UniProtKB/Swiss-Prot annotation:
Superkingdom assignment: Bacteria
Protein name: pyr operon leader peptide
Disulfide bonding pattern of the chain: none
BP GO terms, sorted: pyrimidine nucleobase biosynthetic process; pyrimidine nucleotide biosynthetic process
A Pfam family matched in the record: PyrBI_leader
Designated gene of the protein: pyrL
Keywords recorded for this protein, A-Z: Leader peptide, Pyrimidine biosynthesis
Native species: Salmonella typhimurium (strain LT2 / SGSC1412 / ATCC 700720)
NCBIfam families xref list: PRK10224.1 (NF007587)
InterPro entries attached to this UniProt entry: PyrBI_leader
Lineage: Bacteria, Pseudomonadati, Pseudomonadota, Gammaproteobacteria, Enterobacterales
Residues making up the signal peptide according to the UniProt record: none
Length: 33
């Protein structure tokens, strides 16, 4: 699942500068894993 999430996150990280999008996503991915 992490690989799938990373693939959709990487392009967005470059678009949205990352921090505001990556932090809530990581919190949502932790319980899933």
């Amino acid at each position: 699942m992490v690989q799938c999430v990373r693939h959709s996150v990487l392009p967005r990280l470059k678009k949205d500068a990352g921090l505001p999008f990556f932090f809530p996503l990581k919190t949502n991915t932790k319980p899933l894993n």
